[in-house]
Amino acid sequence: HSVDSSKKAIELTDKNIELNKSFFPKQSEHASFAIDTFDFLETAANKYDVIILDPPAFAKHQNVKHNAVQGYKRLNAEAFKKIKAGGILFTFSCSQVVDTNLFNSTVMAAAIIAKRKVHVLHYLNQPQDHAPSIFHPEGAYLKGLVLYVE
């Protein structure tokens, strides 16, 4: 399944899947949903082998950092509830006010809420072609985790 709140993003996803259908032998099993991801995860009956969470920035300013952390925690907790044992979760943040340590702690809190055992397979950050300046540490805002969920 592909889920995005943007109908345009879903239309582009469907178009790309059609263009690349030779790489998707079970294309008929794919479904796209233009819906809020929180709503989808809370109501979805399926359990998934792989989930990729790549939301837009939840916070661009310090005054909304707490709300962003709560959003990341809720989103990841719902994903942990919907992933099969042995599944892989890719989770990302591009909120510059939520640093890597806070993001990792928030994802850990989500795993605790969902009562799932989780192992970090990879810590991810922005590639070298998007390197931040040493004089602007806030430029290091892209972060992610690849997690194995028991």
Indicate residue ranges for each PLM-predicted region:
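Flexible loop/turn segments at secondary-structure boundaries
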Residues: 8-10, 39-41, 59-61, 97-100, ...
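S-adenosyl-L-methionine
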Residues: 6-52
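Conserved SAM-binding motif I beta-strand of class I
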Residues: 1-4
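Mobile active-site "lid"/loop adjacent to the S-adenosyl-L-methionine
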Residues: 48-78
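C-terminal catalytic and target-recognition region of SAM-dependent MTase-like enzymes
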Residues: 88-150
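Generic hydrophobic alpha-helical scaffold/packing signal
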Residues: 10, 14, 18, 38-45, ...
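Helix-to-beta-strand junctions that scaffold the AdoMet/dcAdoMet cofactor pocket
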Residues: 83-85
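Short beta->alpha junction loops/turns
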Residues: 6, 37, 68, 95-96
